[in-house]
């Protein structure tokens, strides 16, 4: 599925704006999609619906289906064209109707889906577009939610007290996420109608090599001849070829590198009969060799942020202004990488990272797989098929982005209590990722704080990625003990003879809270936390990167462990730097992207 673009052969019409909206229930087809929604209110698209109306808590606490509706008119000048309706993402399960006819269904809230509506939407005609989305998370969704009667992440219930148990049975149904971020829902990314000629370019794959050779494959629906031209950054043609697949050689090739290097981009200009499509790409290599990660043959050190798509009012909704601001703050911080915790981000963000030279660890929404020793998720949760689906959709969508240098299969599953079952679940996904990716990028799985000696899965990944909270959730506030514990664990990982990086670590920090000593939750403690742990990373030549948790404060489910969300951000939710960010900015200014541990 190609990203929609507008050119001399294709038209793209935005359907973003204000739609009609109504909350439903857990009944799947509660409303008639051929009729106007009852008691509809206005809602903005794209955006989460949860925080758009503070006159009521109903949107914030909604559990079940929510309904969107608007009218759509196709211009008469689209006659003779193929017409496609595309959604960037709808969270988590979606159904779409035109004039009451079901045209699309999709499970998974973070990747695009589309439907050919040529036969249903005639030029000059106005139709009723209805979308229903289900925000419920459970043991069959990714991310995972707990079933009724179980706790949400960081919840509390004093289990066993009769009055509490009775109240739980009487309580209204609600989402109980097994993850530490708010379960925002709705039409989160752009909605477009786009056109193509009847015979069209369906897919493009580009596999460049640093010697300038570029393998390409173009999938089309007709028999029209295919012509491809490589354009340099100035739009000059530098190579060309004929046919749906082949190899092109770029003379005097410019490589793509993260800043402060040059993120040089080429364009593969494709024509097929009346259709035209432009696919940008960068020429770079990424590989693991021994205990090093090599980009263009040079040892790489990741200086990165874990992020969330999260902001006030629009929740997880697509925001190009915020994306640009965040990328500029990443540059300001002297960082070079982002981890898309814990789901694939909007496609436009990857385009920006391509242009701006920011490395991306691209992660599936597989977070929350595990419930402790009492539950074997690999035997009891029906997740494997859906997991393969979301992994395939992510890789297919993002395969041509030079910024993407690492696939993450998921975040913090239970790898300790059922180690063989965990390996049997995750290793086929590891193999599938390598099979699906034409560029064969490294693959990892982000593991949580556990008995790492029992974890037989993480050590099999191309890069060992560990989430650790020494000094915060473990050995809280005692940084001497935290460093001792960290070093003992790092000695274990050294024996695996693989590159290792910290994929998540951090400390909740209340902006403006200062203490004479470095006390927990203060800005001073955040500085001390990073200063002490980072010094230990620097002693290990096989330690190849650090992704701090988190770029900015973000919203979570309410509970006794969270006060207005997670405060581990280096920036506040409105993007003001904390003291710890100034420390990291200085640290990262002294660490080169290449050759740091040589």
Q: What spans do the regions from the language model cover?
A:
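Short low-complexity, flexible loop/linker segments enriched in glycine and/or proline
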Residues: 145-146, 352-356, 375-380, 384-387, ...
């Amino acid at each position: 599925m190609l990203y929609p673009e507008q050119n001399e052969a294709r038209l793209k019409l935005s359907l973003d704006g204000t739609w009609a909206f109504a909350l439903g229930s857990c009944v799947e087809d509660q409303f008639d999609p051929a009729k106007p929604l009852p008691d509809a209110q206005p809602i903005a698209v794209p955006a989460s619906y949860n925080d758009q109306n503070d006159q009521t808590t109903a949107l914030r606490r909604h559990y079940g289906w929510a309904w969107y509706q608007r009218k759509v008119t196709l211009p008469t000048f689209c006659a003779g064209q193929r017409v496609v309706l595309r959604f960037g993402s709808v969270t988590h399960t979606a159904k779409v109707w035109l004039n009451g006819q079901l045209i699309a269904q999709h499970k998974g809230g973070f990747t695009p889906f589309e439907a050919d509506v040529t036969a249903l939407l005639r030029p000059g005609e106005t139709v009723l577009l209805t979308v229903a989305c289900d925000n419920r998370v459970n043991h069959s969704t990714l991310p995972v939610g707990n079933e009724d009667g179980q706790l949400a992440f960081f919840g509390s219930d004093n289990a066993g007290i009769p009055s509490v148990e009775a109240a739980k049975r009487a309580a209204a149904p609600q989402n109980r996420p097994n993850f530490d971020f708010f379960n925002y829902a709705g039409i989160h990314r752009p909605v477009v109608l786009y056109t193509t000629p009847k015979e069209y370019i369906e897919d493009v794959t580009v596999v460049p090599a640093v010697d300038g050779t570029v393998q390409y494959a173009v999938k089309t629906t007709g028999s029209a001849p295919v012509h491809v031209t490589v354009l340099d950054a100035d739009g000059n043609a530098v190579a060309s070829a004929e046919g749906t697949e082949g190899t092109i050689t770029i003379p005097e090739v410019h490589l793509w590198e993260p800043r402060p290097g040059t993120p040089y981009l080429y364009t593969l200009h494709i024509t097929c009969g009346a259709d035209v499509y432009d696919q940008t790409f960068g020429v770079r290599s990424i590989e693991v060799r021994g205990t090093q990660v090599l980009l263009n043959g040079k040892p790489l050190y990741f200086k990165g942020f874990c992020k969330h798509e999260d902001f006030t009012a629009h929740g997880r909704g697509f925001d190009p202004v915020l994306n640009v601001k965040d990328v500029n703050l990443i540059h300001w911080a002297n960082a070079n990488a982002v981890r898309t915790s814990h789901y694939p981000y909007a496609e436009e963000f990857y385009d920006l990272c391509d242009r701006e030279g920011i490395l991306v660890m691209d992660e599936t929404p597989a977070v929350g797989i595990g419930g402790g020793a009492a539950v074997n998720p690999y035997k009891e949760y029906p997740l494997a098929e859906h997991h393969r689906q979301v992994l395939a959709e992510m890789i297919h969508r993002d395969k041509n982005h030079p910024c993407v240098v690492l696939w993450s299969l998921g975040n913090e599953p239970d790898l300790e209590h059922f180690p063989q079952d965990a390996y049997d679940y995750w290793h086929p996904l590891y193999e599938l990722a390598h099979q699906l990716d034409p560029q064969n990028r490294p693959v990892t799985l982000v593991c949580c704080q556990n008995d790492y000696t029992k974890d037989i899965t993480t050590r099999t990944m191309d890069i060992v990625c560990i989430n650790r909270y020494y000094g915060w959730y473990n050995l809280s506030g005692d940084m001497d003990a935290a460093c001792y514990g960290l070093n003992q664990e790092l000695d274990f990982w050294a024996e695996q003879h693989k590159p290792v990086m910290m994929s998540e670590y951090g400390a909740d920090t209340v902006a403006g809270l200062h203490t004479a000593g470095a006390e927990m939750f203060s800005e001073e403690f955040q500085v001390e936390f990073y200063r002490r742990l980072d010094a230990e990373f620097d002693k290990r030549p096989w330690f190849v990167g650090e992704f701090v948790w988190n770029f900015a404060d973000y919203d979570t489910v309410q509970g006794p462990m969270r006060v207005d969300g997670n405060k581990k951000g280096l920036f506040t939710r409105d993007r003001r730097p904390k003291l710890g960010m100034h420390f990291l900015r200085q640290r990262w200014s002294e660490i080169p992207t290449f050759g740091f541990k040589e």
